[in-house]
């Protein structure tokens, strides 16, 4: 809960996993201090509020280290079951929802999700979920993107060239994403659901280390 904001309607846009960790720490401290009043430092964590019209969501792109044992030809044939694929002469920055760019073997491809894998569910309908549920997990074997070391994430602010650079060094495959919208974010929150990991790259971002506060001496 937050104080002094009256009837301002608030939604958490980022840092869900860090907030959950802070809650776990707070609950643990409460167990250790059964006489807590609610005013102790461990009952709070730092947050910042922005008006939604001043926030910009950029895509959170993906890079993958291998093709899970598939050859390039086998991999493309496999994903053609769920996506329409078109080779592109230029880098692909998706212009529409359910559209993805794919960089593989120094070539860009445009992927479009087939209608039968689209969903009206506020979470499963997100582009990050479409890619995860229909390609990253079933084809590449990436079941948990939070912990799988074969996948990494690149903020959209770093551009498409960064994806190409990664594929020339430690990765072989990259996906450029269409950014999640504020409306989609609100729909997930209003449904009482959680956003998938690495769904959004928010700007502006606060500098790290602006505030440091000890919970206990």
Role assignments for model-derived ranges:
Residues 11-14:
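Short hydrophobic beta-strand that contains or immediately precedes a catalytic carboxylate
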Residues 17-32:
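Short active-site loop/helix that positions an aromatic residue
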Residues 72-141, 151-171:
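C-terminal catalytic or substrate-handling cores of phosphate/nucleotide-
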Residues 36-90:
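A conserved active-site cap/scaffold subdomain adjacent to cofactor or substrate pockets
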Residues 47, 99-103, 210:
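Short beta-strand scaffold segments in enzyme catalytic cores
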Residues 1-5, 9:
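Single conserved hydrophobic/aromatic residue that forms the stacking wall/gate
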Residues 132-217:
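Charged substrate- and nucleic-acid-binding regions of tRNA-handling and nucleotidyl-transfer enzymes
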Residues 29-41, 147:
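Short mixed-charge
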